[in-house]
Amino acid sequence: MKNLLPFLTRVPIKGDFEKVREELWAFPLVALVSSALPTLVLYLKLPLSNVLAVLALYFTIGLLHLDGLADFADGVMVKGNRERKIKAMKDLNTGIAGLFAVVMVLFLQVYSLQLVPFYAIFLAELNSKLAMLLALATRKPLGQGLGAYFMERMNSGQLLGGFIFYAILLVPVVVYEQNALVSLLGLAFGGYAIKVALDNFGGINGDCIGAIAEITRAGTLLVVAFAGAYLGG
């Protein structure tokens, strides 16, 4: 996991980028680090804790995934064939679709965090990291960028390892609060985002993976918020 942290977070430790793709199974473990600061903010119930928690999250993980979300949305929403969509996604200028997607994801997270228990951000990050692993497991790269680089070493063993660590990290939260199981529904957002990427672009690149991570996290928080508000979760 040491090699993954500098890639998926802003934690100032040294890692070997060449070894990152050998540790894909550890994606879920990164959630322990990426969610630590925002979870603490929520636990302490600080004023405007929902806003501060989102700021703490992006302070930890950076804005790379949000940038990918913007590019992804621009590509998905443009009209035309697959080549035109890919061109729009790779355009350096952010369009209105990308801006809207980023604003909506931030809004959903900030609003949902008012309605969820303090550990929900950990569950959301756990789902987010697993969804990234599932995206790599498609082994359908778009171009020769980071997505293709990681997919070269993606295999059933790495995927199984990721699921095992996902379960190991989820179980203690469920023991603490059984209703935490509802967070599993958040993975549906990730699955849908993967399908959208494949349908629109025919493959998955780094921008798609970042978008999948953001959509899954926001979707998970939304599910947990609805469960808490309407189902007594």
UniProtKB/Swiss-Prot annotation:
InterPro entries linked to this entry: CobS (IPR003805)
Mode of membrane association: Multi-pass membrane protein
GO cellular component term, pick one: plasma membrane
Record's keyword annotation contains Protein biosynthesis: no
Pathway in which the depicted protein is active: Cofactor biosynthesis; adenosylcobalamin biosynthesis; adenosylcobalamin from cob(II)yrinate a,c-diamide: step 7/7
Alphabetically ordered keywords of this record: Cell membrane, Cobalamin biosynthesis, Magnesium, Membrane, Transferase, Transmembrane, Transmembrane helix
Biological processes, Gene Ontology terms: cobalamin biosynthetic process
Family the entry assigns: Belongs to the CobS family.
Primary role: Joins adenosylcobinamide-GDP and alpha-ribazole to generate adenosylcobalamin (Ado-cobalamin). Also synthesizes adenosylcobalamin 5'-phosphate from adenosylcobinamide-GDP and alpha-ribazole 5'-phosphate.
HAMAP family: CobS
NCBIfam families named in the record: cobS
Protein name, UniProt field: Adenosylcobinamide-GDP ribazoletransferase
Gene: cobS
